[in-house]
From Swiss-Prot:
Belongs to the RbfA family. SUPFAM superfamilies: Ribosome-binding factor A, RbfA. One of its GO terms (cellular component) is cytosol. Its main location: cytoplasm. This is Ribosome-binding factor A. Gene3D superfamilies: 3.30.300.20. Monomer. Binds 30S ribosomal subunits, but not 50S ribosomal subunits or 70S ribosomes. GO terms for molecular function: ribosomal small subunit binding. It comes from Bradyrhizobium sp. (strain BTAi1 / ATCC BAA-1182). It is found in: Cytoplasm. One of several proteins that assist in the late maturation steps of the functional core of the 30S ribosomal subunit. Associates with free 30S ribosomal subunits (but not with 30S subunits that are part of 70S ribosomes or polysomes). Required for efficient processing of 16S rRNA. May interact with the 5'-terminal helix region of 16S rRNA. The keyword Cytoplasm applies.
């Protein structure tokens, strides 16, 4: 059976160039948001982290994952970022040396919620009992 791998792809799902550009875009967006350059009241009231950016293989689309500090008001922040998308794309174009400024889309980073859900599950009495009985049998 033939394997279909993207040329130069890595275990994390993108080429070295995709990963490098994604990290550059991530730094640019984090700088823009931390400086308050967008001048939007919904953004100015929040500290926003940018844990990940994923680039499409042609580098024309950047999916930017964001997380407001504390995980509150995610929908408000996403709406504000959508309103300021044109400005943010222009700022990214000035800061990142690419032939074309990538189109951008924003998504909430839900990995923290998932990790918290797993932590709560691991702390339940039933799971603790199973974990303790497994360690006693060893």
């Amino acid at each position: 059976m033939p394997r279909h791998h993207q040329r130069g792809s890595t275990a994390s799902g993108g080429s070295q160039r995709q990963l490098r550009v994604a990290e550059t875009v991530r730094h640019a967006v984090a700088d823009i948001l931390s400086q308050g350059s967008a001048h939007d009241p919904d953004l100015e009231g929040h500290i926003i982290t940018v844990p990940e950016v994923r680039m499409s293989p042609d580098l024309k689309l950047a999916t930017i994952y964001i997380m407001p500090l504390g995980g509150r008001d995610t929908e408000i922040v996403l709406a504000a970022l959508e309103r300021n998308k044109k400005f943010l794309r222009g700022e990214i174009a000035h800061r990142v040396n690419l032939k074309f400024a990538p189109d951008i889309r924003f998504r909430a980073d839900e990995r923290f919620d998932e990790a918290e859900r797993i932590e709560k599950l691991l702390r339940t009495p039933a799971v603790q009992r199973d974990l303790n009985s497994d360690s006693e049998e060893s």
